[in-house]
Every structure is written in C-alpha cells, then in structure tokens.
C-alpha cells in the first residue's frame, strides 16, 4: 500500500471538515428539542389561550409536542429519499452548498415563531430543517467516502457520527435554563443553526468536488487527477485512478440502477437488505428514545438535576465516538457493530430493572444513569457510526446514490416511528418499555453475525465484486461462504 494512502493532507481535512458541519446540524436539531420541552409547551399553551380563550387540553398538548419532535423525521424521510436527485445532477459538494438555503429558512421560521405567536411556524421550521438533515445524511457520508483514501475511509467516515454527537452535546449545553433553554431565549436556541450554515457556505467553495464523481459521472479525468493530487498530497495517484477507471468500466456494463432495480437484481438485493437492516439497527435500538426523552427519563428515575445527567450522556456519547474513530480501521466494522449491539442489549436490561425497582429501592436511580451512559457508549462503538458509512462502502458508484436514498429513508422512517410513538408506548409499558428494544437488539445482533460482511481495507470495486460473485449463486451458498470474498479473513 502506498504511503500516501494513509496521508491526512490539509486539503482532505478541509473537505471532510467542511462536509461534517452538516452532520453537526443534524445532531444539533436532534438534541435541541429535548431540554426546553416545558418552556415550549408553555408557549403552545399561551398561544392556544390567546387564540381560543381556553387552555390547551393535555391530550392536544402531548400530540402537538410529539408532532414537533417527529415532524423533523418526516422532513428527514423526504430529504433522504431525494439525495439522488441532487448528487448526480449538481455534484456532491454543490449539493451540500445549495441545501444551506433550507437551514436559513428554518432558522427564520423558528426564531420568529414566538414573536408571531404561531406554533405552526415552529413546526414548519422543524419540518424544513428535517428535509435539510435528511439530505445531509446522504450527502456527507457519500462525499467523505469518495474523497477519502481506502486506508482512512472508516476513520474519516466516523467523523460524520462525531459531528452528529458534538451537535447533540452543543444543543444540550445551550439548552440549559441558564443559557438559552428559558422562556426568553428559546427562539434563539432553535434558530442558532444559521451559524454553521453560514460557516459551511464560506468553507465549501474551497473544498474539492468528489474525484469519483468527476471521473466516473462526468468523465473529467484531468480534473479528477488534479483533485486527487491535492487530496493525497502526492503526484503519483495512479492506483486511485486505475481503481476508479475499473469501477467506471463496470458501471458502463451495468444498466442505470433505479431504486426498484436494487431489489430486483440478485447482485444488489443482498447489500441493500444489509444496508436497510443496519440503518434500522441504529434507530430501533432505542437510542433516539434516550436522546429525545432523556430529561424526562432521568426525572422518572429520581435524578435531582436530570438536565445535567442528560449532558453527561452527551459527553459519554462524544468520547466513545472518538474511541470508535481510532479503532474502526483496526477492529473492523462488523466486529464493532456486534460489540455495540450486545452491550446495548445488556444495558437495556439493566435500565429496565432500575426503572422497575425504583420505588422500592431509591438507589436504583444511580443504576439507571450507569445503564443509560453504558447504552450510549456501546451505541457509539458500532451502531452509531458504522451504518452511515458502510452503506457507501457496500455499493459501487452507479447504484450508490439510490442505495443511500433507500437506506436513509429507512433510517428516518424508523426515527419518526420512535419519535412519535415512544411517549405513548412508555405510558403503556411503564418501566418495561426498554424490553422492546432489547428484543430488537438481539435480533439485529443475530442478523449482523450471519449476514454482514467485513469491508475494512477493501476498495469499493472489490466489495461490489464480492456481491456480484455471490449474487450469481446465492442459493447454493451459506452466508459465511457468500461473504468470504469480502474479507472474512480480516475479521477480528
């Protein structure tokens, strides 16, 4: 392997850093709605009282609040499904740049919702920033995967998740009552998203377009070669160009890959199934139930200062994402995902025990904090970062946009289901709500063990070739045999 293949150049750092500002936006808007729940609900009540002359009913308030949380995911579903419309027409970098218009519109709507006495403005703003984040969850892993050398693809791909968790942590800190999570400043808390949008608009014009897009989609070999030299910090980019040209030749032999074709073709059916299930394993693990409703969970657990415990979980979240960043290229994607799922299942059982015995044993509140922190830590070992970038690894340039759209749509749909339903399910099941997530985590562990290949150290074309070979005779092979060409020997 060439020394340049592991070189982290200034231009590569700029490209990845500029892109993951979008990831930070996603994380911020996921976490920002949690801490100021009570003051925003009071705004809803006052607005209702001003309009209709009576206080809002508890059932209506619960529905409006759940909608405010979950409409973000509806926007994300629409945005994620639209990824392919933009990246193939405008390119990866320009698509990220254009989408900041949505962030500015959303910031205005949410920032002026209190002044306009309109909770509809807030909900619409949440929907629009959801569309932005849905697009971002497709654009960023795709762009980062395509500009990164093979040896750094996993580590740099994890930066998308790091951007998300840093965004969540910033939202939790800004959401403190003493900072912006109060009656006067909550509109600013929701609209501060214009700052990273502005910063991304400044940085992205200096970032290169994806060399794979330039060569394979646009057939601009000279531009692709020039970009590669800057990204790799070397004049010899022969190996990268050869690999891209081989992928381009393979793409020309294939017909245009639509979303339906992903499910019809034997060569794509297995990787798209893996991509979708890995996305579901991220969202249906219960992690967003913890993020969206962590403050109220800590309150129920008897924690005196629940918002600080929530911030503690955000710090754990960030720290273990950094750990994953350094081990993903050594341990491999599959191994880390399995460890994460198993650890989360164990912590979910602990959480259930702690919440169930809280009234009899007050000290169980401490166990609930340990369980939540452990749950978050194991999430960031595998199920947090890996599903985002492994989708881009499982597909070659042709089917990649369609595959990322399908995987992203699956992610956001399950995100919406959890965001909309968790409060109701929690009211129904009480302390046993996390048993549901435990069962799902065990099922995802079994699927990952038998079906998910190791992609560490493999080029995009090598991975795609493994699936093409497997697709030709799937019925005659066990899962282990099917994925042997993809590097089962490199698993830890």
From Swiss-Prot:
GO cellular component, as recorded: apical plasma membrane; basolateral plasma membrane; cortical actin cytoskeleton; cytosol; female germ cell nucleus; female pronucleus; glucose transporter complex; Golgi membrane
Biological-process GO terms, alphabetical: cellular response to glucose starvation; central nervous system development; D-glucose import; D-glucose import across plasma membrane; D-glucose transmembrane transport; dehydroascorbic acid transport; long-chain fatty acid import across plasma membrane; photoreceptor cell maintenance
Annotated region (Disordered), positions in chain: 468-492
Keyword Membrane: yes
Keyword Acetylation attributed: yes
Record PTM: Phosphorylation at Ser-226 by PKC promotes glucose uptake by increasing cell membrane localization.
Pfam families xrefs: Sugar_tr (PF00083)
Entry-linked InterPro entries: Glu_transpt_1 (IPR002439), GLUT (IPR045263), MFS_dom (IPR020846), MFS_sugar_transport-like (IPR005828), MFS_trans_sf (IPR036259), Sugar/inositol_transpt (IPR003663), Sugar_transporter_CS (IPR005829)
Regulation of its activity: The uptake of glucose is inhibited by cytochalasin B. Glucose uptake is increased in response to phorbol ester 12-O-tetradecanoylphorbol-13-acetate (TPA) treatment: TPA-induced glucose uptake requires phosphorylation at Ser-226.
TM stretches of this protein: 12-33, 67-87, 91-112, 121-144, 156-176, 186-206, 272-293, 307-328, 335-355, 366-388, 402-422, 430-450
Protein name per Swiss-Prot or TrEMBL: Solute carrier family 2, facilitated glucose transporter member 1
Lineage: Eukaryota, Metazoa, Chordata, Craniata, Vertebrata
Gene encoding the protein: SLC2A1
């Amino acid at each position: 392997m060439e020394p340049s293949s592991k070189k982290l150049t200034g231009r590569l750092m700029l490209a990845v850093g500029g892109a993951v500002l979008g990831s930070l936006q996603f994380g911020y808007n996921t976490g920002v709605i949690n801490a100021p729940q009570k003051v925003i609900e009071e705004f809803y009540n006052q607005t209702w009282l001003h309009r209709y002359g009576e206080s809002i009913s508890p059932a209506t308030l619960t529905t409006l609040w759940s909608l405010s949380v979950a409409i973000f995911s509806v926007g994300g579903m629409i945005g994620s499904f639209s990824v392919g419309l933009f990246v193939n027409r405008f390119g990866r970098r320009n698509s990220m740049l254009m989408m900041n218009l949505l962030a500015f519109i959303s910031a205005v709507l949410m920032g002026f919702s209190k002044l306009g006495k309109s909770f509809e403005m807030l909900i619409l703003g949440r929907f629009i920033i959801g569309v932005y984040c849905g697009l971002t969850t497709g654009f960023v892993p795709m762009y980062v995967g395509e500009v990164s050398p093979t040896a750094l693809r996993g580590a740099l791909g994890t930066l998308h998740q790091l951007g998300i968790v840093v965004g969540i942590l910033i939202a939790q800190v800004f959401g403190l009552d003493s900072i912006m999570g109060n009656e006067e400043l909550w509109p600013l808390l929701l609209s501060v998203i214009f700052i990273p949008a502005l910063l991304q608009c400044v940085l992205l014009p200096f970032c290169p377009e994806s060399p794979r897009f330039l060569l394979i989609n646009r057939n601009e070999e000279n531009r692709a070669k020039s970009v590669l030299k800057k990204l790799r910090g070397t004049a010899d980019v022969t190996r990268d160009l050869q690999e891209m040209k081989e992928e381009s030749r393979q793409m020309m032999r294939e017909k245009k890959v639509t979303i339906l074709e992903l499910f019809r073709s034997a060569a794509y059916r297995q990787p798209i199934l893996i991509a979708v299930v890995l996305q579901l394993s991220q969202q249906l693990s219960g992690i967003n139930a913890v993020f969206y409703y962590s403050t109220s969970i800590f309150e129920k657990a008897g924690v005196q200062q629940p918002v600080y415990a929530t911030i503690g979980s955000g710090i754990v979240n960030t720290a273990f994402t950094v750990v994953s960043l350094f081990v993903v290229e050594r341990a491999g994607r599959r191994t880390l995902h399995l460890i994460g799922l198993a650890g989360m299942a164990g912590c979910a059982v602990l959480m259930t025990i702690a919440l169930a015995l809280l009234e009899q044993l007050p000290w169980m509140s401490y166990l609930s904090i340990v369980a939540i922190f452990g749950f978050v830590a194991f999430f960031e070992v595998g199920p947090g970062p890996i599903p985002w970038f492994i989708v881009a690894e499982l597909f070659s340039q042709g089917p990649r946009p369609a595959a990322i759209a399908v995987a992203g749509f699956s992610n956001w749909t399950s995100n919406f289901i959890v965001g909309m339903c968790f409060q109701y399910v929690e009211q129904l099941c009480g302390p046993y709500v996390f048993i549901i997530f435990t069962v799902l985590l065990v099922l995802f562990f079994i699927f990952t063990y038998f079906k998910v290949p190791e992609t560490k150290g493999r080029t995009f074309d090598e991975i795609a070739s493994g699936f093409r070979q497997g697709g030709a005779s799937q019925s005659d092979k066990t899962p282990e045999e099917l994925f042997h060409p993809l590097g089962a020997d490199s698993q830890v």
